């Protein structure tokens, strides 16, 4: 059996955990959900960049558990909104907002914006912290357009309103295997794996 690397996923977001575990399986790694550990303090995402939040999560979790940890911060950058919601993507409609509340607020803010000006990207920054080593940071992006109506039932977050012209589908219409080829998280993971080879 090949040597498998164990890494704590510094997130409680189950959508991200599932996606990371599919990506980890391809690389021979094992991602351990933060939910499997009792008493781990919540990491406050108070940085103003994806990299700052990803590093903070990975460093704090790795230090607390004395294990390798992978921090992720990702979000949606909408050009017509000057990059918003950005690092506030998960809280766009409020601190405890649901995914649907967030994308509904986004659609409302873009009501008067033409289709050509609804360009956006999902961006992901990963930070891998291994005790005693320098952090490794990678980024990935997936370009698209914000649709006017939601479509699809796969995925999470803003996936139902994120249209990918090159695939002629919404992110939420992609099967996991398709998403793992083109998503911002998959691209950041591929870059990370290249760095640590």
Residue spans of the language-model regions?
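Anionic-ligand binding patches
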Residues: 2-8, 14-33, 37-197
């Amino acid at each position: 059996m090949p040597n498998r690397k164990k890494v704590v996923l510094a997130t409680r977001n189950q959508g991200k955990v599932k996606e990371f575990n599919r990506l980890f399986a391809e690389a021979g790694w094992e991602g351990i959900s933060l939910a499997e550990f009792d008493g781990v303090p919540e990491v406050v995402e108070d940085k103003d960049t994806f990299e700052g939040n990803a590093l903070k999560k990975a460093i704090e979790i790795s230090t607390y558990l004395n294990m390798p940890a992978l921090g992720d911060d990702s979000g949606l950058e909408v050009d017509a909104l000057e990059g918003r919601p950005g690092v506030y993507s998960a809280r766009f409609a409020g601190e405890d907002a649901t995914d649907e509340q967030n994308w509904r607020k986004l659609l409302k803010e873009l009501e008067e914006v033409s289709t050509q000006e609804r360009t956006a990207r999902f961006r992901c920054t990963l930070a891998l912290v291994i005790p005693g080593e320098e952090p490794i940071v990678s980024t990935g992006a997936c370009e698209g357009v914000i649709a006017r109506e939601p479509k699809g039932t796969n995925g999470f977050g803003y996936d139902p309103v994120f249209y990918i012209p090159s695939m002629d589908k919404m992110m939420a219409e992609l099967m996991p295997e398709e998403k793992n080829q083109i998503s911002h998280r998959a691209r950041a993971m591929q870059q990370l794996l290249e760095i640590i080879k």
